Amino acid sequence: MAVSKESTIFPVGTIFVDRGNYLTGDSVILFYQVVRCTERTVWYLQNRAQVVAYDSAALRKDLVPIADTYNPKAKPHMARILREKTFHCVKSPTGDVMLPWDGQPVSQYYGY
């Protein structure tokens, strides 16, 4: 069996953003951070979950990942790296496509 080589497609520390919903109907913004990446697979941990209210004009402007929010007992998610025409992406635990975070504060109109 071939051993997968480490890759820099998504370097360790890369942040992904995803949006989800709780059963109560509240929206939540999730930040995931890459902990390992090979040629075909990426492992990432959730490092922030922030409930947001869409009845407000916009989300909090300081909604960015918090690097020191880390649960040592958390198990990383594993996802296959998907290749679209000109870029790579991964799927979130809920099955939505995630792209790397662009470094801008997340707003109500953030493009996922």
Report the location of each language-model feature.
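Mixed-charge, low-complexity intrinsically disordered regions
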Residues: 1-31, 41-112
